[in-house]
């Protein structure tokens, strides 16, 4: 009998594998366990507000360095390309970049350098190109609908640096080259010498322009187009709830964007109550009277505030075009109905417990005895990637001319 589970990959695309890796990573981090199965709706709202961004992105600089590395490869002579594929070159240069940035900012307390903790002889565990590829496509920095692997395979080493075509471009009559699909502020073959994690003025202006011309109803595009980016960054909006309050009070943004933020915040608040009851159930099962008292007080405060009803839940699902797995959609409807009708906590706890067990089955936290010092389990109020987006937008804003 096997004592250890193993995972194998079906080779669909790098995005498919990255999505699974993200899930595995999240399961090892506090506050990300999706015990109630609402992650798809959370991600649906995040994709509307912050398309292309993810929770594992760190700094804006990688939106520049990845296309620079690809452009460097495309500038090589065909003979040099035949000796090394774009995939090999990209991996090599991204590892060199990690070392260069780490040395450049040594002992400066700089955060967000991918690969800064790797030791001699090691490689970056998660290359920036895989982390930022969707963002590069979404914001028009690299013009392609191909996955990262498809794009890398499409640039054949034996071809001219100006002659490589992508799978989705095969029928283009004008023969668009891979080189012309890479957009940058300027070509700088010496860019890696003295590279910094911060953006130059030219790079910041370029990314600022890309955000302005990105998905029109996304929050980054609206903040750029309305001239409100500096204002939102100057505010102490560290959490999504604070951001939602600011957006509600700011008429300069498109109504569709404001509506999306409002719906996302309402969803976060409604489902926070369910996660609160879930933690009360867990605390009761584990005889944690200290946590039980604490969470019951939080519940009393939460329950005083009016929450979204079933009609709003239907609007959320329509707006995000999300189909929730299993009976999660029914659970959301029933939860909102019960809250609107002030149903007893006995019924609420039974509903939450049923959903958790139906979602996770034998893997549910409810089936496990937890350590004596455990704290909050699973999700709390949702952030929708705002923390990561805020850092990247701040990088861009700080690089712009005064």
Stretch-by-stretch model annotation:
Residues 1-402:
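Non-catalytic recognition/regulatory regions in large multidomain proteins
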